[in-house]
Amino acid sequence: MTKILDGKKIASILREELKQDIITLKERGIEPKLAVVLVGEDPASVAYAKFLQKVSENAGVLFELHQLSKSTAEEEIICKIEDLNQIQAVHGILMMMPLPPHVNKQHIMEHISPLKDVDGLHPFNRGHLISGGICLHPATPTSCLEILKRSGITLAGKHIVVVGRGETVGKPLVFMALAENATVTVCHSRTVDLGKFTKQADIIISAVGKPGLITADMIKPGAVVVDAGIHEEAGNIIGDVDYEQVKEIAEAITPVPGGVGSLTTVLMLKNVLKGIQLQIGTQE
């Protein structure tokens, strides 16, 4: 019988670990704080900020929202970020996306302190991820591997096919999987005969955002399938994988929703705590 990799269950365990780590920090006089910067009033961003506030406060992380108008100049946003960089009581900074068209996302991300970059998207963190250094990792690729490891699935020596080469999931996932001693193949939208490669995989991780991309005839019996794709259709969130068909062949599979996405918020909060350790290290 196919094993369903329950992201919600793993997220619950991670939340308890997070709470215990926060208790330990508070005993040392450290109150973890996350600052969120939101430009404009994008409904999905506003809703996520409210959700994040609830999750943060339930875990014991202080939360503050800095909401700026949609017309705020890029220079003003950068000034706000640099102010937060200088405040020692702020340990993590999250820049909500999307940004207005007049704002350069790359410029903004480059101004967030890499030690407070809970998204793990600063060039410093990207570089250290590639070189194997200590840094903050992006939450979604971390979630993909965490689900596997916490489910008792060995990564070392396995052939992992990553489908997707995006900056936030696919690319970092490749180097994170290599660090786990997996053999990694990368496929993407221009790959010819995608199934030729996925059929060779022990583990498939898809992060494209295209419904039905991974079908049953594209995997070998006994493969593990992790679906990190997100697509909204008729008010429902669906992934890249033809779940009902693939689960009949796969040894293990993540559902959407209830899989990879269930872990991302708590893993981002864990980055706040990891950032604290890095910040303390630079002060000593």
Curated annotation (Swiss-Prot):
Protein purpose: Catalyzes the oxidation of 5,10-methylenetetrahydrofolate to 5,10-methenyltetrahydrofolate and then the hydrolysis of 5,10-methenyltetrahydrofolate to 10-formyltetrahydrofolate.
Species this chain originates from: Desulforamulus reducens (strain ATCC BAA-1160 / DSM 100696 / MI-1) (Desulfotomaculum reducens)
Lineage: Bacteria, Bacillati, Bacillota, Clostridia, Eubacteriales
Protein family: Belongs to the tetrahydrofolate dehydrogenase/cyclohydrolase family.
Any Pfam family the entry gives: THF_DHG_CYH
Molecular function as annotated in GO: methenyltetrahydrofolate cyclohydrolase activity; methylenetetrahydrofolate dehydrogenase (NADP+) activity
GO BP annotations, alphabetical order: L-histidine biosynthetic process; methionine biosynthetic process; purine nucleotide biosynthetic process; tetrahydrofolate interconversion
Matching Gene3D superfamilies: Leucine Dehydrogenase, chain A, domain 1, NAD(P)-binding Rossmann-like Domain
Name of the molecule in the record: Bifunctional protein FolD
Cited InterPro entries: Aminoacid_DH-like_N_sf (IPR046346), NAD(P)-bd_dom_sf (IPR036291), THF_DH/CycHdrlase (IPR000672), THF_DH/CycHdrlase_cat_dom (IPR020630), THF_DH/CycHdrlase_NAD-bd_dom (IPR020631)
The EC number(s) this enzyme carries: 1.5.1.5, 3.5.4.9
Catalytic reaction(s) noted: (6R)-5,10-methylene-5,6,7,8-tetrahydrofolate + NADP(+) = (6R)-5,10-methenyltetrahydrofolate + NADPH; (6R)-5,10-methenyltetrahydrofolate + H2O = (6R)-10-formyltetrahydrofolate + H(+)
GO cellular component term, pick one: cytosol
Assembly description: Homodimer.
Gene label: folD
Record key words, sorted: Amino-acid biosynthesis, Histidine biosynthesis, Hydrolase, Methionine biosynthesis, Multifunctional enzyme, NADP, One-carbon metabolism, Oxidoreductase, Purine biosynthesis
Domain of life: Bacteria
